[in-house]
Amino acid sequence: MAAEMELKRIPSPPRIVAISGIVFSGLFIASLVLIRLAAPADPKDPGIWLSDPALRNWVLMSLNLVPFTGIAFLWFMAVLRNHIGLLEDRFFATVFLGSGLLFVAMLFAAVAVTRGLMDAFASADSILVQPETYQLGRSMAFALMNTFCMKMAAVFMFVTSTIGLRTAVLSHWLSFVGFSFGLVLLLVIADFAWIALLFPLWVLLVSAFILYSGFNKDSTNPVSHRVG
């Protein structure tokens, strides 16, 4: 029976799908770095960066990467569920799916608000006409990204690490790294914007572990891969 369950847990999708987490990490890191370098992290900034064409282009490039980032993350979630296989628990699976989908939703909402601000205020001078509108949109985008989005990322890390410990589908050290990173995101993300990079770095580690364990399983038991 144990051998049969092991066979069913072997990933059935193409192996290339497992790199979706690596793709997400690369895109999300690039997007975060671009927007952090171009726009101030302070939600009360006066919007001087809007008058610089180069900085505006950096922000637009960052925003254009986000849709692909979200798509890659959805595939990463599917890879994780496939890796868990029959060991998936309904209780934790509900939190896993909910936090992951809310993370993507909050990410897209933050980008939509930011893009709306850039379209409404083509330069720093236009902010002088309606400064309250700019500050409202800027604060909303900051809250969506740095409060709600990252808190959902922290919950996703907690529940994935918990599943990893309970089912042994992830190594113990990787689960503890997830708990540590999630706690940091949950407590101090609003004060240190660069800490948001912890989430894509953790996803990168998990993706590398899944790829390594998959290839290692194939090399030690090539027949099981053909059966799956």
Language-model segments: which ranges?
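Hydrophobic, aromatic-enriched alpha-helical segments typical of multi-pass transmembrane helices
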Residues: 2-228
